[in-house]
């Protein structure tokens, strides 16, 4: 199975080499100012254009807030299935993507197949797949594409961006935490947390 990546954004061509370093053979690049900030409409139009043109068997999207938004819009437009929050993926001998995800409140695991439509689409939770060793010497093919989309064609306008990302000593990565303790305003103060 050949691995390809889609890179969409504004001045993001440098990310193509990163994709090659982690195993992509091809990168489909859409690089334009209209993609500067994530908005559903331009991104899903770009992905749908690429899927309709190149006909991939499988499309995987990270199960992040933005990834879930994008994958849902793309699957709806393409009239294909989408398995959300997969915790396991495999390809069987008939080239079906075996998409495993928790069901019924996490009490059982369900394996889902998309038999009749293409592409087979999944959003994938973090840490489901092993990260391959980075090989900066790997090269691949960049396929530049564009769609005739102007800023005035997009219904949602970005008026202001407020950066809420902390860096340095203030940064907290809860995705890597083994235990997270949380409480609401009813706790009144941190002193009321007794573990």
Question: Where do the model's predicted regions map?
Answer:
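N-terminal glycine-rich FAD/FM-binding segment characteristic of electron-transfer flavoproteins
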Residues: 1-195
């Amino acid at each position: 199975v050949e691995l390809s990546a889609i890179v969409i954004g504004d001045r993001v061509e440098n990310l193509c080499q990163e994709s090659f370093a982690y195993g992509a053979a091809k990168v489909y690049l859409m690089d334009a100012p209209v993609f500067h900030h994530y908005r559903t409409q331009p991104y899903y139009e770009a992905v749908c254009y690429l899927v309709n043109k190149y006909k991939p068997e499988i499309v995987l999207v990270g199960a992040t807030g933005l990834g879930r938004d994008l994958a849902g819009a793309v699957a709806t437009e393409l009239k294909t299935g989408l398995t959300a929050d997969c915790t396991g993926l495999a390809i069987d001998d008939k080239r079906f993507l075996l998409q495993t995800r928790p069901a019924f409140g996490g009490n059982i695991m369900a394996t889902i197949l998309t038999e009749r439509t293409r592409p087979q689409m999944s959003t994938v939770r973090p840490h489901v797949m092993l990260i391959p060793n980075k090989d900066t010497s790997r090269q691949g093919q960049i396929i530049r594409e564009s769609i005739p989309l102007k800023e005035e064609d997009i219904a949602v306008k970005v008026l202001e961006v407020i950066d809420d990302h902390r860096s340095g000593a203030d940064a907290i990565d809860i995705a890597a935490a083994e235990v997270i303790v949380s409480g609401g305003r009813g706790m009144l103060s941190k002193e009321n947390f007794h573990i």
